[in-house]
Amino acid sequence: MRNMVSEISDLSLAKEKSEAQFIARNPKSNDFHCKACDSLPGGNTRTVLHGAPFPIFIEAGYGSKLRDVDGHEYTDFLNELTAGIYGHSNPVIKKALMQGFDEIGISLGGTTTCELNYAEALKSRFLSIEKIRFCNSGTEANITAIIAARKFTGKRAVIAMHGGYHGGPLSFAHGISPYNMDSQDFILCEYNNSTQFKELVNSSQDIAAVIVEAMQGAGGAIPADKEFMQTIQLECEKNDIVFILDEVMTSRLSPGGLQQIYCLKPDLTTLGKYLGGGLPFGAFGGRADIMSCFDPRLPGSLSHSGTFNNDTLTLTAGYVGLTELYTPEAVKRLNALGDGLRKDIESYCHNTKMSITGLGSIMNIHFTESGRVNSYNDTAGEVIELKDLLWMDLLKEGFWIARRGMITLSLVLTESELEAFKLTIKAWIHRRMSLIRI
């Protein structure tokens, strides 16, 4: 067996070579990045898209394809980190937006039937939602759901999960950040640890809510154990704690969201991403008694305003996308394709540091010394250089994924594109076997 020093040296050389090729292939992206640094801190306004030596600048998207400013075309296997489920410039969405401009208009400053129609459509899909409100992002939905839980219970503390992500000010990848919103009010639990969760619930009488993903998205597409989620639901019910299920990413995994698969009935559900039809969107909803905290007819109710909460274009695009494109049949088909893709890639990973996690149309590639990822803790020792190498090598082959290894599918990907991606991954494993073999 080759020693670890040699392996690290070989990996460093391979990455340096790929990075040099990356720089040579993308001079215009480099130039745009340098120019952007004059106006934007680090040339960036969305941290997740930053990466050394510089990010690729995308010029256009069409169907399942992206084109960058240097003229390279990619098949998109990231799809806006789950938000781009309809592909790029979907004709049905485009038609709905143009009709919205022509027949409804924008910036109306009043209540419209758009919000009523979409609220009813979402309620019919996500059965735990009795009442719903709209906002502008999944982050805002999660923040406002926590505010509702505090108002409803009169309590303050919130249990979140290590590795969880509920928006920039609610990020728990490295514990509780002192820069998180109300960081002193959060209690952290290990994901999939039912025993610890019960202990935390019993340790305080001031817990207003639990916020959790049934599959950690930004944390690496790590699914929850069903027993863990059932424990959360039961303990919340027993202790008058509001159970907030973050389905901003995962609502796409079945017709009724991941809560349908896990047989859950959360008190509040948060939504976002693709449900805006490609435009900024967030929503939160659930039990009518909790949501009545926002009923402006009631004394002492919470104020929840936002100029674009009922934006006509977003609600029109979201409604058309959900009712005409991402129908229950389409949901099942897309997630079956995702399960098949993940299982095929998994079969290529035997005896390597590479593994793949996820459910349905959302998945994530990992590189660990053991070749196994069963919890967020297992990602602590990820070989980031291998993720970087895979990402740069896939760019050369014309495929776009997240640098962190995330893959999400869209409705417009064809079976031939899926097959080409699988074969490229298989060939990459063979080519880089000396670097990834256990």
From Swiss-Prot:
Q: Could you tell me which Pfam families the record lists for this protein? A: Aminotran_3 (PF00202)
Which residues are recorded with the post-translational modification N6-(pyridoxal phosphate)lysine?
A: K273
What enzyme category does the UniProt record give?
transferase
GO cellular component: a single term: mitochondrion
Q: What is its EC number?
A: 2.6.-.-
UniProt entry tagged with the keyword Ribosomal protein: no
Q: Does the keyword Zinc apply?
A: no
Q: Please tell me where this protein is predominantly located.
A: mitochondrion
Q: Which GO terms describe its molecular function?
A: glutamate-1-semialdehyde 2,1-aminomutase activity; pyridoxal phosphate binding; transaminase activity
Names of required cofactors: pyridoxal 5'-phosphate
Gene3D superfamilies attached here?
Aspartate Aminotransferase, domain 1 (3.90.1150.10), Type I PLP-dependent aspartate aminotransferase-like (Major domain) (3.40.640.10)
Q: Which GO terms describe its biological process?
A: porphyrin-containing compound biosynthetic process
Q: Where in the cell is it found?
A: Mitochondrion
* Source organism superkingdom: Eukaryota
Similarity-based family = Belongs to the class-III pyridoxal-phosphate-dependent aminotransferase family.
Q: What name is this protein filed under?
A: Uncharacterized aminotransferase C417.11c
- Organism source for this protein? Schizosaccharomyces pombe (strain 972 / ATCC 24843)
